[in-house]
UniProtKB/Swiss-Prot annotation:
Region spans: A: 90-110
Identification of the protein by name: Insulin-like growth factor 1.S
Keyword rRNA-binding listed: no
GO CC aspect terms: extracellular region; extracellular space
Biased composition regions of type Polar residues, renumbered to the chain: 139-153
Function in brief: The insulin-like growth factors, isolated from plasma, are structurally and functionally related to insulin but have a much higher growth-promoting activity. Promotes head development by inhibiting Wnt signaling during embryogenesis. Acts as a ligand for IGF1R. Binds to the alpha subunit of IGF1R, leading to the activation of the intrinsic tyrosine kinase activity which autophosphorylates tyrosine residues in the beta subunit thus initiatiating a cascade of down-stream signaling events leading to activation of the PI3K-AKT/PKB and the Ras-MAPK pathways. Binds to integrins.
Family: Belongs to the insulin family.
């Protein structure tokens, strides 16, 4: 009886090993498939290089790249090291009609704002801003004085 029990145990172990090997083989194939897909995706995106960005996609990308600094659609005069370009060219010319990369996008970001103390902001607010003057519009006297009488035409 003990030999019969050993035989069934060995058969179970062998059957279990076969199932485990089959599952391992399937899992390896799935992992290999994922690895190949990842490789192809990365290779394709690396080969693509700079992209063209237009419209809302360009604005969203600039907001992401520049963050709280904000951005310009055209470079300020004298901004950047390449002065041979016309100052009329803007981000749309460079990134929508042609391809541009991250560094090109970053050139259109506004400079970082420097933190000011609360006192300097308060002082600046009172000294730098002129008082709003009321606009005085003269009365229209071209029709003449009609008094309280209403004229019909």
């Amino acid at each position: 009886m003990e030999t019969n029990n050993n035989l069934s145990t060995q058969l179970f172990k062998c059957y279990f090993c076969d199932i485990l090997k089959l599952k391992m083989h399937k899992m390896s194939c799935i992992h290999l498939l994922y690895l190949v897909l990842c490789f192809l995706t990365l290779t394709h995106s690396a080969a693509a290089g700079p992209e063209t960005l237009c419209g809302a996609e360009l604005v969203d990308t600039l907001q992401f790249v520049c963050g709280d600094r904000g951005f310009y659609f055209s470079k300020p005069t004298g901004y950047g090291s390449n002065n041979r370009r016309s100052h009329h060219r803007g981000i749309v010319d460079e990134c929508c009609f042609q391809s541009c990369d991250f560094r090109r996008l970053e050139m259109y970001c506004a400079p970082a704002k420097q933190a000011k103390s609360a006192r300097s902001v308060r002082t600046q607010r009172h000294t730098d801003m002129p008082k709003a003057q009321k606009e005085v519009h003269p009365k229209n006297t071209s029709r003449g004085n009609t008094g309280s009488r209403g004229f019909r035409m």
